[in-house]
């Protein structure tokens, strides 16, 4: 220990010692009061002379390093302590708990304020604001790849854009006026994106193929007039149509349409499916639902199928997740291979919904959908579930080899035992129709309902191989001879004032002569969609509301008798069944004997085509100045990748198809009365049913009419070109549309009723 007079061995300038620990406590208190410094190295303690250091005890000197170490840590902690504290009202915990509603309101205010400001900037003329926004496709597109529609815009000196009428995942649909053809059209504008373009090109190819085989436009498929590229968007020009069957149901307050009108829709749909099943087409629609079936005229029952955006040809199936859920077939739910039979399942669901007003199977998800199907139809056959990849998603196999429904995970939904929710009761076969609303009405007898129920059950067969096919469905006894019926929903919409005001109106129609010419029209003011090709009519004026949308009549009065289909064996003569597909047109079919219904036919068989020419009476061009702009349809599609065409080279069953029109179709027997369909009703289903999966499609002889004005390219295909600067190539001209003739027609109370279009869903 050094004495007081001794000096330290170290240089005084190098010593920076703190006082003793007891003294430093006061020093810390003083340090806390001093202003904080950003550089701790600038904060120094007072210098201590060598004499003071020598006077310290040894124990105090030992504690000095510890004091030097503790002091910086405490000072650092003091510096980290906030000098001011947050207002408790603004704390996140409070905002997300006690003040949660207030927080959400503030978020909404900020969000909508920004949205409103952007909207105002978009409409303003200030160029400075427009420069701030990102430009897509030279300013023609929005950030969703959709074309920015401007009302009144003129495209290629031909199309005048009127308004946006529909929007979906595929793009948009606009109403436009074609100055060249002088008619209203619906233009489907595809998104400016490769995936949507590829899928739309498939739709174009299928529509061209169908229109090529249906030049008379009598198989209820929407007519694609032409297509072109405009500002990097593929545009499809369709004929003008009216609203869809879902809109019609909504107009009945979801009470459903009459059984007679349901029959009209059913027969047209079966004819369309028969057309799609021809071997040259073999097209699966894949998305049949009320929204995709459109009325040609709001006053009439003629319909057309639209939206082939998710369609494919047999053998080119690339998707497993298809069809809207309510109308999804069991084989699709179970992950099995599918064919054209899935569209027949969808049709069965649609027909029940059109009459009852409610979906038959309204599942919230796939499991719920299957459970609701089982409620009505029971457990699917074991041989189907044994082969289904997704069977155990819905069912479980018991030790004895049978299958039963799995219990739902949530346990909230309670279902009726399998097969106990009878279609008999859903349709109200013996109780006056659905909800008893049809009791006492003409055409709604128990016998009528029994025929309807039998047809629906055949359409809803679990096994796609034994599910009824369009050819046999058209021969079902449900399709009896009926007069034309408009979309009259007077018995269903008692609460609609607009409907009640229209119920008192009525019209009569003149019938055409037996020569096949169109000699008159109804005085209801129905006219062709082409204003330059008006038929002479006996009324005096045309109703402006439907002048641009009449597309119901496709063929004149013709009575056709087709030869018996090739491939029938045996000596028993086939039964002749006369099918009246038009009020003035009849077609005779040869129904196969029961035991020899259809056999595979190999080799080259000759096809017989019957051509009937139209004779029209014309007068001058109709003025367009006062034409009312009708509503048209929305047609959403599903995007998918491109598919290549594939020929179906399997053996087919040869038979003849209906020559049908958009008017009411009915089946009657020319030789056996009501027993004309006996050959079909008693046929052994399992033995004689066609297997679409193996044979491709039914070989149906369809009458094909050539179009002398159609330009063809290689292999007879229509020629067309894509151009962003020039007008579209006219590769598909309009087929002749004659005025539909018939007797005892009723003016529909739908006339003049503005029906709100259903929202477009992304399917």
UniProtKB/Swiss-Prot annotation:
Detected in brain (at protein level). Ubiquitous. This is Dual specificity tyrosine-phosphorylation-regulated kinase 1A. The modification Phosphothreonine is found at residue 402. Changing residue 321 to F: Suppressed autophosphorylation on tyrosine and reduced tyrosine, threonine and serine kinase activity towards histones. The gene is Dyrk1a. GO terms for molecular function: ATP binding; histone H3T45 kinase activity; identical protein binding; non-membrane spanning protein tyrosine kinase activity; protein kinase activity; protein serine kinase activity; protein serine/threonine kinase activity; protein serine/threonine/tyrosine kinase activity. Inhibited by RANBP9. Inhibited by harmine, leucettamine B and leucettine L41. Interacts with RAD54L2/ARIP4. Interacts with CRY2. Interacts with RANBP9. Interacts with WDR68. Interacts with SIRT1. Residues 159-479 form the Protein kinase domain. The modification Phosphoserine is found at residues 14, 310, 529, 538, 748, 758. CDD domains: PKc_DYRK1. Residues 502-525, 654-672 have a biased composition (Low complexity). ATP binds at residues 165-173, 188, 238-241. InterPro entries: Kinase-like_dom_sf, PKc_DYR1A/1B, Prot_kinase_dom, Protein_kinase_ATP_BS, Ser/Thr_kinase_AS, Ser_Thr_dual-spec_kinase. The active site is at 287 (proton acceptor). GO terms for cellular component: axon; cytoplasm; cytoskeleton; dendrite; nuclear speck; nucleus; ribonucleoprotein complex. SMART domains: S_TKc. Residues 33-56, 115-136, 408-442, 485-540, 596-679, 744-763 are annotated as: Disordered. A motif (Bipartite nuclear localization signal) lies at residues 117-134. It catalyses: L-seryl-[protein] + ATP = O-phospho-L-seryl-[protein] + ADP + H(+); L-threonyl-[protein] + ATP = O-phospho-L-threonyl-[protein] + ADP + H(+); L-tyrosyl-[protein] + ATP = O-phospho-L-tyrosyl-[protein] + ADP + H(+); [DNA-directed RNA polymerase] + ATP = phospho-[DNA-directed RNA polymerase] + ADP + H(+). It is found in: Nucleus speckle. Belongs to the protein kinase superfamily. CMGC Ser/Thr protein kinase family. MNB/DYRK subfamily. It holds the Pfam family Pkinase. Can also autophosphorylate on serine and threonine residues (in vitro). Autophosphorylated on numerous tyrosine residues. Residues 598-620 have a biased composition (Basic residues). Dual-specificity kinase which possesses both serine/threonine and tyrosine kinase activities. Plays an important role in double-strand breaks (DSBs) repair following DNA damage. Mechanistically, phosphorylates RNF169 and increases its ability to block accumulation of TP53BP1 at the DSB sites thereby promoting homologous recombination repair (HRR). Residues 595-625 are annotated as: Histidine-rich domain (HRD).
């Amino acid at each position: 220990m050094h004495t007081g007079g001794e000096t330290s061995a170290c240089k005084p300038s190098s010593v920076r010692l703190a006082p003793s620990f007891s003294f430093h406590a006061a020093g810390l208190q003083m340090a806390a009061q001093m202003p904080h410094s950003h550089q701790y190295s600038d904060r120094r303690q007072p210098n201590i002379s060598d004499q003071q250091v020598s006077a310290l005890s040894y124990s105090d000197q030992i504690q000095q390093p510890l004091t030097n170490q503790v002091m910086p840590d405490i000072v650092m902690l003091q510096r980290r302590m906030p000098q001011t504290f947050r207002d408790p009202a603004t704390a996140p915990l409070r905002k997300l708990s006690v003040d949660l509603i207030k927080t959400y309101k503030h978020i909404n205010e900020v969000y909508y304020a920004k949205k409103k400001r952007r909207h105002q900037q978009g409409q303003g003329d200030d160029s400075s604001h427009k420069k701030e926004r990102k430009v897509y496709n030279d300013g023609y597109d929005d950030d969703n790849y959709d074309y920015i529609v401007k009302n009144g815009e003129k495209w290629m000196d031909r199309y005048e854009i009127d308004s946006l009428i529909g929007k979906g995942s595929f793009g948009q649909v606009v109403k436009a006026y074609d100055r060249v053809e002088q008619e209203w059209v619906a233009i489907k504008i595809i998104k400016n994106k490769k995936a949507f373009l590829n899928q739309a090109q498939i739709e174009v190819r299928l529509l061209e193929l169908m229109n090529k085989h249906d030049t008379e436009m009598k198989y209820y498929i929407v007519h694609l007039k032409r297509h072109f590229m405009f500002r990097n968007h593929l545009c499809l020009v369709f004929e003008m149509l009216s609203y869809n069957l879902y809109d019609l149901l909504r107009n009945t307050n979801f009470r459903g349409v009459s059984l007679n009108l349901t029959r009209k829709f059913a027969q047209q749909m079966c004819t369309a499916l028969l057309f799609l099943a021809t071997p040259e087409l073999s097209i699966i629609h894949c998305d049949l639902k009320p929204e995709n079936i459109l009325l040609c005229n709001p006053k009439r029952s003629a319909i057309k199928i639209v939206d082939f955006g998710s369609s494919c040809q047999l053998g080119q199936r690339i998707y497993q997740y298809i069809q809207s859920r309510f109308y999804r077939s069991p084989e699709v739910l179970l992950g099995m291979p599918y064919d054209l039979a899935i569209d027949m399942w969808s049709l069965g669901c649609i027909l029940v919904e059109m009459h009852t007003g409610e979906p038959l199977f309204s599942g919230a998800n796939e499991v719920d959908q299957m459970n609701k199907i089982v409620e009505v139809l029971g457990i699917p056959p074991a041989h189907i579930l044994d082969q289904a990849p997704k069977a155990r998603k819905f069912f479980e196999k018991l030790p004895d080899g049978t299958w039963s429904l799995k219990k739902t995970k949530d346990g909230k939904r309670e279902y009726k035992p399998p097969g106990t929710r009878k279609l008999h009761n859903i349709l109200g076969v013996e109780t006056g129709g659905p909800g008893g609303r049809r009791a006492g009405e003409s055409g709604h007898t128990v016998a009528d309902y029994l025929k309807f129920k039998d047809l629906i059950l055949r359409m809803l067969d679990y096994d796609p191989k034994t599910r009824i096919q369009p050819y046999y469905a058209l021969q079902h006894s449900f399709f009896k001879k009926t007069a034309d019926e408009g979309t009259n929903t007077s018995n269903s919409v008692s609460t609609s004032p607009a409907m009640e005001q229209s119920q008192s109106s009525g019209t009569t129609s003149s019938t055409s002569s037996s020569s096949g010419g169109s000699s008159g029209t109804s005085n209801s003011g129905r006219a062709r969609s082409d204003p330059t090709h008006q038929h002479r009519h006996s009324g005096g004026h045309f109703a402006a509301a439907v002048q641009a949308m009449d597309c119901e009549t496709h063929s004149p009065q013709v009575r056709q008798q087709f030869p018996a289909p090739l491939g029938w064996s045996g000596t028993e003569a086939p039964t002749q069944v006369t099918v009246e597909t038009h009020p003035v047109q009849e077609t005779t079919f040869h129904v196969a004997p029961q035991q020899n219904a259809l056999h595979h036919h190999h080799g080259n068989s000759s096809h017989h085509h019957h051509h009937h020419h139209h004779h029209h009476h014309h007068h001058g061009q109709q003025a367009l100045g006062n034409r009312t702009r009708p509503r048209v349809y929305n047609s959403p599609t599903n995007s998918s990748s491109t598919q290549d065409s594939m020929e179906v080279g399997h053996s087919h069953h040869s038979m003849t198809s209906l020559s049908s029109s958009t008017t009411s179709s009915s089946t009657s027997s020319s030789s056996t009365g009501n027993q004309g369909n006996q050959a079909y009703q008693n046929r052994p289903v399992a033995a004689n049913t066609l297997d679409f999966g193996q044979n491709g499609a039914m070989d149906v002889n369809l009458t094909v009419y050539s179009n002398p004005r159609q330009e063809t390219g290689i292999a007879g295909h229509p020629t067309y070109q894509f151009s962003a600067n020039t007008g579209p190539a006219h590769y598909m001209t309009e087929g002749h549309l004659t005025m539909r003739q018939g007797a005892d027609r009723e003016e529909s109370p739908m006339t003049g009723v503005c029906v709100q279009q259903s929202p477009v869903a992304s399917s």
